[in-house]
A protein has these predicted regions:
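Feature marks short, surface-exposed loop/turn motifs that line or immediately flank catalytic pockets
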Residues: 158, 219-222, 266-268
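Short N-terminal helix/helix-N-cap motif within the alpha/beta-hydrolase-1
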Residues: 193-197, 224
Length: 329
């Protein structure tokens, strides 16, 4: 599945290897545009990266794009639901609270929120979410009692000010000021053209002892090896860099960070999404499992099997996405 279209000399933007690297032709499949984009996989650090950045990325982030589409306030309109979510999400982020722990067993918190429980946070911690879209995760945190938080995303139409006080600002991380205890990238880092410059900004903004959390798809995975250019999380052309474990370590070292921990948190999406792409079914198709499960090519037994396989791959450090916890040296 991973036979390259050709080999071509390119300069790796991560490790600076100027060599002949395998090149892959990858189609846009979220919206079924089927445009082809060329990626190369560095022979040294193994980072898979787009060869040429498209001049206009706006057409690949239309209205209704995943991270912009949800108004998180709709989850908090019923008093009972609001209370349950607040208690659950406080436990999800901090890992503390018996009642929240009990609720979480029956009503699990989102994985991106639970990723924070490995960091020593308090509700007074200053948290910056970069590339947060409409700010759904931050909204959950704000409702759970975290008030020193800010979201930034250059792709939103305008600044967002929610009724509860949360602000999401239309800006780049390089424009942010102040100091922060946690700076996090939940599936946004792979969309950024200059990851080293981004980490340089993070380094300036982090408080001593602060943490940078990067949650991304990883090419060091079974899904890439098995599905190749049909791997759903390749997501051309929106994902500019699909990091390997080595390439992210190299990038971190360049800005004097070290990776303190890695947690694999992939799910069944890596299988049903990639199987759809193999069969020419886009993510937004009427036949897509995400749009219409009953009309998809999968039954529930298959989805359950995909889920179990994903959990095993995570245990084996072979899942197709992971959370990296970076600290300054």
């Amino acid at each position: 599945m991973n036979s390259p279209a050709e080999t071509r000399k390119n300069l790796c933007r991560i490790c600076d290897s100027n060599d002949y690297h395998p090149v892959y032709r990858v189609r846009e499949m979220m919206y079924g545009l089927s445009e082809e984009f060329l990626y190369f996989k560095c022979v040294q650090c193994e980072c898979l990266q787009i060869i040429k950045f498209p001049e206009d990325m706006s057409r690949y982030y239309p209205k209704g794009y995943l991270s912009f589409a949800t108004d998180p306030s709709c989850f908090y309109r019923k008093p009972i639901e609001r209370w349950v979510r607040r208690v659950r999400d406080s436990y999800g982020a901090l890992g503390k609270g018996f009642l929240g722990q009990w609720i979480e067993k029956f009503y699990p918190a989102p994985e991106d929120l639970k990723a924070l429980s490995r960091i020593s946070l308090t509700k007074q911690s200053k948290i910056l979410d970069v590339g947060c879209g409409a700010g759904t995760l931050l909204y959950l945190l704000y409702e759970a009692g975290f008030s020193n938080i800010l979201g930034v995303d250059p792709h939103i139409d305008r600044d967002i000010e929610y009724e509860n006080g949360l602000v999401v600002s239309r800006q780049e991380v390089q424009e942010v000021t102040g100091s922060w205890d946690l700076i996090m990238f939940h599936h946004s880092f792979e969309h950024m053209q200059e990851p080293l410059k981004v980490l340089q900004s993070v380094s300036k903004l982090l408080n001593p002892g602060g943490c940078c959390l990067i949650r991304i798809p990883v090419v060091s995975s079974f899904a890439w090896e098995d599905y190749g250019v049909h791997w759903v999380q390749l997501d051309a052309p929106r994902h500019f860099f699909l990091h390997s474990l080595d390439s992210l370590r190299i990038l971190a070292r360049k800005e004097k960070f070290h990776i303190e921990d890695i947690v694999f948190d992939s799910d069944e999406f890596q299988f049903w999404g990639s199987e759809q792409y193999k069969n020419g079914i886009s993510l937004r198709s009427e036949k897509s499992y995400s749009m219409n499960p009953a009309q998809s090519i999968f039954n529930q037994e298959q989805i359950d099997r995909f889920r179990r396989k994903a959990m095993q791959l995570n245990r084996d450090a072979r899942g197709d996405q992971a959370v990296f916890y970076l600290k300054k040296n």
